[in-house]
Amino acid sequence: MTKLPNMTTTLNHLFDLPGQICHVQCGFCTTILLVSVPFTSLSMVVTVRCGHCTSLLSVNLMKASFIPLHLLASLSHLDETGKEEVAATDGVEEEAWKVNQEKENSPTTLVSSSDNEDEDVSRVYQVVNKPPEKRQRAPSAYNCFIKEEIRRLKAQNPSMAHKEAFSLAAKNWAHFPPAHNKRAASDQCFCEEDNNAILPCNVFEDHEESNNGFRERKAQRHSIWGKSPFE
């Protein structure tokens, strides 16, 4: 076992040894050692003591380096150079990352990013179209007539079923003159919309028709229509 600085003085002696010379690098002081290994131990794990730091190393000869010394030294030099280049590259990338972080955290960048977000939101609002508003349709004359007729019939006879009142109201609508029905129902709808107050235009009186057996209603004499067609 010989250290690298003493290689020139013991080179001839090592070549005369009955074995194989391998190169081992100490894992503690990184000194390259020349180890003479007998041919019978080339497939074994041997213990080597470093002549520089006296550390004990376990060397697997199956993985040991048997290449010439000058090639091993050049490979070690390239390995160290590569490590230095990698470290320098990592340092440059770390500096660039720090600079980018400082730019992103600066107030100017935050303000500009918020402005961009506001512009995007405003664009979205401009693109979205509002759906058309649904207009509430005014109730028809028939609906107004049926509603008021059912209310009137139930006021006279509270025990009357809604279905029966609806059927009777429909019959009354069918037997009334069409023009009279439409005008009366329309006027009554307009009167109810005025503060929900029922004006004299929707005051009716009832009488039973003895011949046909159905109910009628007609406007009073003081209403805006004057006499009804049945008087």
UniProtKB/Swiss-Prot annotation:
Family matches, as InterPro entries:
HMG_box_dom_sf, YABBY, YABBY_C, YABBY_N
Give start-end positions of each zinc finger (C4-type): 26-53
Protein name listed in UniProt = Axial regulator YABBY 4
| UniProt-annotated stretches for the region Disordered | 98-120, 211-231
* Keyword set includes Kinase: no
Quick check: keyword rRNA-binding in the entry? no
User: Its function?
Assistant: Essential for the formation and the abaxial-adaxial asymmetric growth of the ovule outer integument.
Which cellular components does GO assign to this protein?
nucleus
Q: What induces it?
A: Autoinduction down-regulated by SUP in adaxial region of the ovule outer integument. Negatively and spatially regulated by HLL, ANT, BELL1, NZZ/SPL and SUP.
Compartments annotated for it: namely: Nucleus
The protein's matches in Pfam families, at most eight in alphabetical order, are given as: YABBY, YABBY_N
Which organism is the protein's source? Arabidopsis thaliana
BP term (GO), one: polarity specification of adaxial/abaxial axis
Q: Which UniProt keywords apply?
A: Developmental protein, DNA-binding, Metal-binding, Nucleus, Zinc, Zinc-finger
Residues folding into a coiled coil are none
Tell me the gene name: YAB4
